[in-house]
Every structure is written in structure tokens, then in C-alpha cells.
């Protein structure tokens, strides 16, 4: 038996400036303003999209995050369907090696 800690890691390399440029390119299609793209225009354009409530354009970007958490937490994340998910199966457990269990996070009970 192997006890592991809950954790997370961002699997996608992130370049904020490039992300903003790709979102701007997609968003300017909606406003027929592709000709107004400059080296410096992405940040203010994306801010404008958010202020106008045009958040669907932000969905043109994605990142991959790996969460190691207990099944209860993963089911809560998945049921709200905020993204696309791939989840480790409990069906294909390898019993010939160490079985991994996630150490549950318990808040400081003295505070309650």
C-alpha cells in the first residue's frame, strides 16, 4: 500500500502574451476588426471582451491541469462540467504492485 498526497500540476506550458494574442485573433473575428491587431492590442481587447460579458471567446484557449485528489472531490469537479475531463479508472487497478491511496486532507479541527 502506498499513501500519496493530493496535489496539482499545470501540464501545459503557459505563455500569457501568446494566449492573449490567440484570444484576440478569435474575438476580433466577431467584431470584424482583424485589421486593428497590433503587437500591443491583445491585453486591452481581451479586457474589453470580459467587461462586455463576451466570455465565450476566452474558451478558444485551454490548459491541461493534473489533479491528484480523492474520488469524492473529483466527482464534484466533474459533475459541474466546467471543462473536459479524463479520469483515472478504478476498474483497471493493478493489484500486483503497490495500490495507491490518497491521504485525505483534514482541516485543522481545533478551529471548529
Where on the chain are the PLM-derived regions?
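Family-specific signature for flavin-dependent thymidylate synthase
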Residues: 1-112
